[in-house]
Amino acid sequence: MKNIRFDVEYDGTDFCGWQRQPGGIQTLQGELEAQLGRILQENISLTAAGRTDKGVHARLQVVNFMTGSAMELSKMAHALNSLLPDTVRVSNPHVVPLDFHARFSAKEREYRYFLLEEPSALRCRFTGCSKGSLHIGVMQDAAGLLVGEHDFLLLSKEPADKKNPVCLIKECEWQEENGVFVFRIRANRFLRSMVRYLVGVMIAVGRGRAVPEDLGMLLDDGLMTFPLFPAEPNGLFLWDVSY
């Protein structure tokens, strides 16, 4: 048996998230496993670095799987890309150690969120929208409060995250590039929907509906002083994974 790693890039708009689901629901894991199984004539089970939600994209998702196939890896990747939708591509196939695990071997992950102040018909698949003017200075102040180790349980919608809700944020910042507000966050791990909730909080800050100190109280004291809403999924990308 060999342990194979692929890098995967995808537009998540038309998928119901990464994780395989019953009942014929279209997911990225389900699509990739089905087509790999068709090529290799094996039951394939993929492990991924991040389980992205419905509508979330990936510039770099990392997956691995075990196979007994002797097929040349470049041919395997080419065959897989020929069967996948145009919105999903695999690249960089290579054999990795048997103990490599795309999720648990990862040291850091980076997400980016792309945000517009007003809707765009041409960019709506890949940007969220604040539907109003933003003050990037106070949003950056709020982002600075996130650096370090914090309990993010209130910013997750996954009950299983209660077991270990602490994440170490390594880098976190907002930048404006040609009218697009870009949020970049790098951490050792993330809870489910955590980045979308963080962006939602900072949109509230940027529009004057909250202040950075409200985020501080949420993280330090577990106090919610304003309604929490996750940002739209379409602006979010799994951007990088480090091993």
Swiss-Prot record:
<comment type="function">
    <text>Formation of pseudouridine at positions 38, 39 and 40 in the anticodon stem and loop of transfer RNAs.</text>
</comment>
<dbReference type="InterPro" id="IPR020094">
    <property type="entry name" value="TruA/RsuA/RluB/E/F_N"/>
</dbReference>
<comment type="subunit">
    <text>Homodimer.</text>
</comment>
<feature type="active site" description="Nucleophile">
    <location>
        <position position="53"/>
    </location>
</feature>
<dbReference type="Pfam" id="PF01416">
    <property type="entry name" value="PseudoU_synth_1"/>
</dbReference>
<dbReference type="GO" id="GO:0003723">
    <property type="term" value="F:RNA binding"/>
</dbReference>
<comment type="similarity">
    <text>Belongs to the tRNA pseudouridine synthase TruA family.</text>
</comment>
<protein>
    <recommendedName>
        <fullName>tRNA pseudouridine synthase A</fullName>
        <ecNumber>5.4.99.12</ecNumber>
    </recommendedName>
</protein>
<keyword id="KW-0413">Isomerase</keyword>
<dbReference type="GO" id="GO:0031119">
    <property type="term" value="P:tRNA pseudouridine synthesis"/>
</dbReference>
<dbReference type="InterPro" id="IPR020095">
    <property type="entry name" value="PsdUridine_synth_TruA_C"/>
</dbReference>
<dbReference type="InterPro" id="IPR020097">
    <property type="entry name" value="PsdUridine_synth_TruA_a/b_dom"/>
</dbReference>
<keyword id="KW-0819">tRNA processing</keyword>
<dbReference type="InterPro" id="IPR020103">
    <property type="entry name" value="PsdUridine_synth_cat_dom_sf"/>
</dbReference>
<dbReference type="GO" id="GO:0160147">
    <property type="term" value="F:tRNA pseudouridine(38-40) synthase activity"/>
</dbReference>
<dbReference type="InterPro" id="IPR001406">
    <property type="entry name" value="PsdUridine_synth_TruA"/>
</dbReference>
<feature type="binding site">
    <location>
        <position position="111"/>
    </location>
    <ligand>
        <name>substrate</name>
    </ligand>
</feature>
